[in-house]
A protein has these predicted regions:
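Hydrophobic-face positions in mid-chain alpha helices that act as interaction patches
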Residues: 6, 53-164, 213, 223, ...
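Extended, hydrophobic/aromatic-rich amphipathic alpha-helical segments that build helical scaffolds
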Residues: 6-20, 28-60, 159-190, 213-223
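Helix-capping and short linker residues that terminate individual alpha-solenoid repeat units
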Residues: 14-22, 63-66, 71, 196-197
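Long amphipathic alpha-helical coiled-coil segments
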Residues: 21-25, 242-244
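A cross-kingdom marker of C-terminal helix-rich interaction/assembly modules
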Residues: 186-193, 267-271
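C-terminal soluble interaction/assembly domains
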Residues: 197-200, 205-214, 228, 236, ...
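C-terminal functional modules
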Residues: 223-288
Length: 288
């Protein structure tokens, strides 16, 4: 069944791409760039890294612009740095974002927001020092007994559309898996230069595929936070096994872990769907 779904997605994209302009009439209308980007994402999820690289390159040939987070932070750091001030800044990831292949927003969706969500302290620790994307979007705040990182940017944020940063990082991983580690790190560092402050920036290098993927995954988890992408990557890497990882965090003094093999990674079919005779007979996809 999974293979049939992949084939349906690929057929849909490959059939439509020939009739699409490079970019849509508006950012709400996908063009070839969005189709190529979705093909790259799909092939990556299928672990077909040759094809994922091919389509990431095709998407980047249409649009390779990245958001300048260093510039955005420098433009706004005066107000961001003010003690006790939590500004509301217009996001660079809105309708006019230059890194879009297409814009996807829906009210009341976890993949869309009119303001960036706050994040807990343990999640903030996952960003690199000097990360202007982090510094532009979050600032530590304590309210009563709770300390967290308050979101600072607002606007209709493109969390669900196809973006160039994802394509760069797909390309980097695919190159790493071909053991082209220098090329992979060059692609990653090209992206990092847009969000690591110059005084903190040091180019990354990797001596193994595992090290390269660890760096790339950190960048992808952070740059595409609140999108479906980090979850999709986790599912793929958990299934592959080689680069699986256990997630841990502390809540109320208690250590909580999520193992790669946990059933909690799988969304069960809704009971209503299983009980509905119109859906035919199918088996629940998790045991718990």
């Amino acid at each position: 069944m999974i293979q049939e779904i992949y084939e349906f997605i690929l057929n849909d994209l490959n059939t439509s791409v020939a009739d699409l302009p490079d970019m849509g009439t508006t950012l709400l209308h996908p063009g070839k760039g969005a189709a190529y980007a979705m093909l790259a994402r799909t092939y990556l999820q299928m672990m077909n890294y040759e094809k994922a690289l091919e389509f990431a390159d095709k998407a980047l040939a249409i649009n390779d612009k990245l958001v300048d987070w260093v510039g955005f932070y420098n433009d706004n750091k005066g107000v961001i740095a003010q003690e006790g001030v939590y500004p509301s800044l217009k996001t660079p990831l809105g309708f006019d974002s230059q890194d879009c292949y297409n814009f996807n927003y829906a009210d009341n969706s976890s993949n869309s927001a009119s303001a960036i969500f706050k994040i807990p302290v343990n999640r903030a620790a996952g960003f690199e020092e000097g990360d202007a994307y982090f510094l532009s979007n979050w600032k530590q705040r304590t309210m009563g007994a709770e300390t967290y990182y308050q979101g600072l940017t607002n606007g209709y944020i493109n969390l669900a559309g196809m973006r160039t940063v994802e394509q760069y990082l797909i390309k980097a991983e695919c190159l790493a898996r071909k053991n082209q580690l220098t090329d992979a790190m060059d692609v990653l560092n090209e992206v990092r230069k847009t969000y690591i402050l110059p005084e903190k920036y040091q180019p990354l290098s990797a001596s193994s595929v595992a090290e390269a993927i660890r760096y790339i995954r950190q960048a992808k988890d952070n740059q595409l936070i609140f999108s479906i992408v980090p979850f999709g990557d986790a599912r793929r890497l958990n299934a592959e096994g080689t680069y699986a990882r256990t997630l841990t965090k502390e809540i109320d003094g208690k250590q909580i872990s999520l193992a790669p093999s946990s059933h909690l990674w799988t969304f069960p079919f809704p009971k209503g769907a299983i009980d509905n005779p119109g859906n035919g007979s199918f088996v629940q996809n998790v045991e718990k």
